[in-house]
UniProtKB/Swiss-Prot annotation:
NCBIfam families: rsmG_gidB
Species of provenance: Pelodictyon phaeoclathratiforme (strain DSM 5477 / BU-1)
Keywords associated with the record: Cytoplasm, Methyltransferase, rRNA processing, S-adenosyl-L-methionine, Transferase
Keyword Cytoplasm: yes
CDD domains linked: AdoMet_MTases
EC number: 2.1.1.-
GO cellular component terms listed in the entry, alphabetical order: cytosol
Protein name (database record): Ribosomal RNA small subunit methyltransferase G
GO molecular function, one term: rRNA (guanine-N7-)-methyltransferase activity
UniProt superkingdom: Bacteria
Family statement drawn from the similarity comment of this UniProt entry: Belongs to the methyltransferase superfamily. RNA methyltransferase RsmG family.
Length: 228
């Protein structure tokens, strides 16, 4: 219980520093998710087992930083592509209970863990589905999220047919992305002009644990920055 309270206070402080006001019940749910994630990680490999930062910072707070650049709306349909242990989809689903999240991953054990965590946390606006993204048919989304390490051009090719007109791809990535962005822009001819614009938002100033991290926002022809 003491560790849970420490995680709640840590997350509350970090979010407040970024102007993110989150009520106590939601902070407690986010901390519970962190505990679930660590517990499941002992069973299957969801996140690195050689952590250099607390899970509440490196994974959960990191996921929440997307909200600095994107306002999730009521009724918005969001795809979490390659969700792994539910990141960033589960933290964001807790923060935005009126937004719909679909979490997909090609590894069945990871999705089973996500389903168990969603059930344990009582989340009713997120579904975890075991599938390959190429097999998603007949569905489109307002926003696609990804925290996986795939190159940006591949993430764009996966996302283009799954995004509604004006939709946006948001990635959490690290390192020098110059070559990845160039490759993604070169590939847009066969993807109805997606991407037409790529924004980079470094977050190294927020925490030393994010020294090389950036939030990448990829727009199509008809999309615009959604940070109202």
């Amino acid at each position: 219980m003491e560790r849970m309270n420490d995680n709640v206070l840590t997350l509350q402080m970090l979010c407040a520093e970024q102007g993110m006001e989150i009520d106590l019940p939601t902070l407690q749910q986010l901390a519970r998710y962190g505990d679930c994630l660590e517990r499941w990680n002992h069973k299957i490999n969801l996140i690195s087992r050689k952590e250099d930062a607390p899970v509440i910072i490196k994974h959960i707070f990191h996921s929440l930083l997307i909200t600095l650049y994107h306002s999730f709306r009521e009724g918005e349909d969001v795809l979490d592509l390659g969700t792994g242990g539910g990141l960033p989809g589960i933290p964001l689903s807790l923060l935005f209970p009126r937004t719909r999240f679909l979490l997909v991953d090609a590894t069945g054990k990871k999705i089973a863990a996500c389903q168990a965590m969603i059930t344990e946390l009582g989340i009713n606006n997120a579904i975890a589905l075991h599938t390959r993204v190429e097999e998603l048919k007949g569905v489109v989304f307002d926003t696609v999220l990804s925290r996986q390490v795939a190159p940006l051009d591949k993430l764009c090719s996966y996302s283009a047919p799954l995004l509604k007109a004006g939709g946006t791809l948001i990635c959490l990535k690290g390192g020098n992305l110059e070559n990845e962005i160039a490759a993604a822009m070169k590939s847009n001819k066969g993807q109805e002009g997606f991407p037409s614009k790529v924004e980079l938002h470094p977050i190294h100033g927020i925490s030393p644990f994010f020294s090389e991290k950036q939030i990448v926002i990829v727009h199509g022809k008809n999309s615009s920055a959604n940070n109202d």
